[in-house]
Structure formats: structure tokens, C-alpha cells
Amino acid sequence: MVTLDMIRKPVEGDLEAFEQFIRQKFTADGTLLSEMLDYALSARGKGIRPMTVLLSAALNAPAGQRSGGLRTLLAATLVEMIHVASLIHDDVIDESDMRRGRASVNARWQSRNAVVVGDYILAKNMDLGLKSGQFDLVTHVCGAIATLCEGEILQNDKANRQEMTRASYLDIIYKKTACLIGVSASAGALAVGASREKQALMRKFGESIGMAFQIQDDILDYTRTARTGKPSNNDLREHKVTLPLLTVLESVGEERRRELQARLARCHEEDESVEYLQHIVCLLYTSDAADE
């Protein structure tokens, strides 16, 4: 079985350089802001996006050229800090108290401060990119911010209208997850001077990984515990219709579907409805749908 550590191994040295780079560039004056920023940076998870940048750069660098240079570290930083800011904003929107097994930024410092520190990270990130003079990298990455916002609005609209379809679900996870991972892969290629054709291939590869990653993550939300860093059934509590529940809704009749949707609407207030839907999904849903 291929593990994340095995995938990470070829760029371990570059990842260490990236950590030093990001810590050096993201500092702040003021005790509260500095504390919040350090807290956000210390719980960034597995680092899938910067690792993707570095692996793509290593794959596409010309023979004899160092793939982990300043442009590559900058590209990795740009995508990672967009991701960090988006998670802070997501937790505010979803009123989530936990992030990766500990209190979220909004739970610890209130939502009003969390929104500002998320904005600060985005502003600091763009300032870093522009001052570097690497305008091609900044332009390449910036579009992902708008795409993330589009995905969030679409998800909220579909949830409020109870109109989630498989097509809209796939569109949402592309915009909220796969797009930035795709940009990470293509940014790594761009950083080392790869052709546009290779950049496009790397982006498609990254997007495919991102789609698979998010589908698996949505499945795990019905089974994992807080030990893994996110409460089980969190999507239900936030009224999010992801692939497991969507598959069940597609498989039942209209009357039964309305009943399940009514249960979903009460999940934020009722643990009983959460447990009921979790049981139904686990009973009727199999990993065959994810494979499809």
C-alpha cells in the first residue's frame, strides 16, 4: 500500500525549506494577530497542496535544474495560504467549533476576529506574491480564490433550496477542493518553466486527485470520529448533502425523499435526526458508488 509518507519522501528536503519559508514570511505585529496567525499555521494538516507543487516541480524541472528554488517555494506558499484562509472562513460560515482535533480559530477568538485573520492571510499572501515580481505565478494562482467563493455560494444555494443533484455536487467539490489542487500541480510545473501543454496535463492530474480526495473525505465524514480531526456527521449537522446521502436520496421514492430531507433540516438542532440519517446512509450506501 502506498502511504503519504512514501509520496512525500522525494521532496522531504524541499518541504522542510517550505516550512522555513512560510514561517519567515508570515509574521505579524501585535500580540493577538501574531498568536492567531501562529495558531492557524500550526494546524495545516497533511500539506497536500504544497507537496503537490513540489512534486510537480521535481517532475517537470529540466535535467540538472534544482526544482525547489525560490519560485517553487513561492508557488507552494501561495496555494497553501489560500487554503488556510479558506478553512478559517469555512469554519465561520459553518459555525464549526473544531478543526483537526482542536478548537477552530473562530471558537477560540470569536468569528469577527477569525474573519479578519482570514482576510489578513489572503492580503499578506497576495502582497508576498506581488512584491516577489513573479507575476506569472500570482496570476496563475489568484483565479482559484474566485472559484472557491463560487463553490461556497453554490453549495449554500443548493442546500437552502434542497436542490442538490449529482451534477451540482460534482461542480461544488471541483470548485471548493479539486480546483486548488489542480492549480497546485500546474503551478509547480510553471515554476520550473514547463510548457503550457505540461502545465495543462498537471492541472488535469491534480484536479482528478482533488475530486477523488473530496469524495473519500465525504464518505469518511459518516464514519470517522473526532480523533481524526473532524467530528463524525459534521456534514449532516451543517445540512450539507454530499455523495453518500445524495446516493440514498436518489434511490428512494418521492415521499421517502421528502421525509429524509425534513430530517436533514433538523440536524443542526436534533442529534436524533443526525443519528437516524447516519444509520440510513450506512445501511443503504456502499463504496461502490464512490468507485463509480
Name each model-derived stretch.
Residues T3, G69, T165, R266-S273:
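A diffuse structural propensity rather than consistent per-protein peaks
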Residues M6, P10, A43, I172-K175, ...:
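Short, surface-exposed alpha-helical recognition segments that flank or form part
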Residues M1-F21:
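N-terminal amphipathic/basic leader segments beginning at the initiator methionine
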Residues Y285-E292:
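Conserved small/polar residues in nucleotide/adenosyl-binding loops
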Residues V252-R266, D271-H279, L283:
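Gly/Pro-rich interdomain helix-loop hinge
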